[in-house]
Amino acid sequence: ELPTIPLPFLMFIMIGFVLVIDLLGLAVTGLFLPFMELFTFNITNATALEWIFAVGFMVFTQPVGEEMIFRGVLFPLMRARLGAVGGLVANAAAYALFHLVLYTSQIGAVDPRALIWYGLIAPFLDGLILACVRAYTQSTSAAIVAHVVFGLFAIVKLFVITG
């Protein structure tokens, strides 16, 4: 039986991972950009309702929806079919391709390096980390909590970028 991870400790670990991925993105692209989901969000002109929707999307809707699909349904199927490592990699690749298709138009015009990093590599790393959380804890709920941390970080980063 695997040891359980207290959720506050898991959240703390996820802050470290998201910081490392974000700093790698800055090193690779030379650009400090908001997360793709918030790329077109205008912080200065946003209404209270737009803020509620943005925060709700980043810390509830997206983490729950994506984790239920990618880690709750697809990951067990991929792991059963491809083995432990193959399932992790295939799940992360599917997650990355989903994000690439969904957000390419928003970030592609900025810089080709940004498109490759923020559109494919960073989502792959995020997906790999989230799949590892799911595999280690055997809990989709833990993956949702980890994803919530990514969403909270995205909101904080948006504030940092826009001052």
Regions found by a protein language model. Give the residues of each.
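Interfacial transmembrane-helix boundary/kink motif in multi-pass membrane proteins
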Residues: E1-L24, I43, A80-G83
